[in-house]
Amino acid sequence: MNTVRVTFLLVFVLAVSLGQADKDENRMEMQEKTEQGNSYLDFAENLLLQKLEELEAKLLEEDSEESRNSRQKRCIGEGVPCDENDPRCCSGLVCLKPTLHGIWYKSYYRYKK
């Protein structure tokens, strides 16, 4: 019975002492992997940043193209007061004096041609 206890104690001591060495090795290995992982994270972060910058540039180009061609879309429509001397009327609309008298007898309004 004593030999079993001594054997068990010896195996236990060996396992603990070897396990400690493995812990130190594991800790060092984990530090190395973490440092490598940080470099991978930096690489991935830079790659993502480049993609986002490209996407932003494309969106800004689309916005500028839209603003060049959007004058007709933002044109004030029919039945809106206008200035008779202002030539910037939308295509298909003319600035005319209303035919009916009322509260707007001195104003000019936009009508279809």
Curated annotation (Swiss-Prot):
- Specify the species: Cyriopagopus hainanus (Chinese bird spider)
Q: Which GO terms of the cellular component aspect does the record hold?
A: extracellular region
Propeptide regions on this chain: 22-74
Its domain description in UniProt is: The presence of a 'disulfide through disulfide knot' structurally defines this protein as a knottin.
A Gene Ontology molecular function term for this protein is: sodium channel inhibitor activity
Record keywords, A-Z: Disulfide bond, Ion channel impairing toxin, Knottin, Secreted, Signal, Toxin
Region feature Disordered, mapped onto this chain: 61-83
The region annotated as signal peptide is 1-21
Subcellular location(s) per record: Secreted
Name of this chain's protein: U11-theraphotoxin-Hhn1w
**Physiological role:** Probable ion channel inhibitor.
Q: Which InterPro entries match?
A: Toxin_22
Question: What does UniProt note about where in the body, tissue by tissue, this protein is expressed?
Answer: Expressed by the venom gland.
Q: What family does this chain come from, according to its entry?
A: Belongs to the neurotoxin 14 (magi-1) family. 01 (HNTX-16) subfamily.
Disulfide bond among the record's keywords?
yes
Cystine pairs: 75-90, 82-95
* Keyword GTP-binding attributed: no
- The organism's superkingdom is given as Eukaryota
Give a single Pfam family match: Toxin_22
